[in-house]
């Protein structure tokens, strides 16, 4: 319990640091110029899993590319609010995204149990000069890290309203 509380306090403090104005008055959170911040790619499986890519930019613009087993194939665009983008970045921060391994697949420490024929979700975050990407194989089970990533991926989809293009 004490360890969880300590982790929560550290995560909250780290999040506050991300959103404090810089000394020159410029916002230290979301960059003003349009840069790629978050990506989510859902890959093929043995079946009819939706295959698509999302890119979220610092100005809230969303680019979608539908590939297979989706309602909308090809390109589409959308938009999320600055607040939604900040909340998504906070979700990445809360799970210590930059500290997680680049690949979670059968045989790795974070994949104690693995099943075949599942899709992967590949996420990335570019934030405050750092960039990290994680290939999360959805056939992996048995680790809290997996559930945290799955929830993060679902929150990205929800913020963007990906269902408008995939269902």
Predicted feature locations:
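Short, well-ordered, aromatic-rich surface patches in folded extracellular/luminal domains
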Residues: 2-6, 22-46, 52, 70-72, ...
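Bacterial N-terminal signal peptides
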Residues: 9-18
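Structural signal for glycine-centered tight turns and loop->strand junctions in beta-sheet-rich domains
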Residues: 58-62
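Beta-turn initiation residues at beta-strand->coil junctions
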Residues: 64-67
């Amino acid at each position: 319990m004490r360890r969880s509380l300590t982790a929560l306090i550290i995560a909250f403090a780290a999040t506050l640091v991300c959103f404090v104005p810089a000394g020159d008055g410029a916002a230290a959170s979301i960059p003003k110029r349009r840069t790629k911040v978050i990506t989510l790619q859902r890959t093929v499986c043995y079946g009819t899993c939706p295959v698509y890519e999302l890119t979220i930019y610092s100005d809230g613009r969303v680019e979608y590319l539908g590939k297979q087993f989706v309602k909308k194939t090809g390109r589409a665009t959308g938009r999320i609010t600055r607040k939604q983008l900040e909340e998504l970045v906070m979700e990445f921060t809360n799970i210590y995204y930059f500290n997680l391994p680049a690949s979670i697949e059968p045989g790795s420490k974070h994949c104690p149990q693995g099943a075949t024929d599942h899709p992967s979700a590949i996420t990335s975050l570019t934030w405050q000069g750092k960039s990290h990407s994680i290939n999360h194989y959805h056939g992996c089970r048995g680790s809290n890290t997996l559930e945290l990533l799955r929830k993060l991926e679902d929150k990205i989809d929800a913020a963007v309203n990906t269902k408008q293009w995939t269902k």
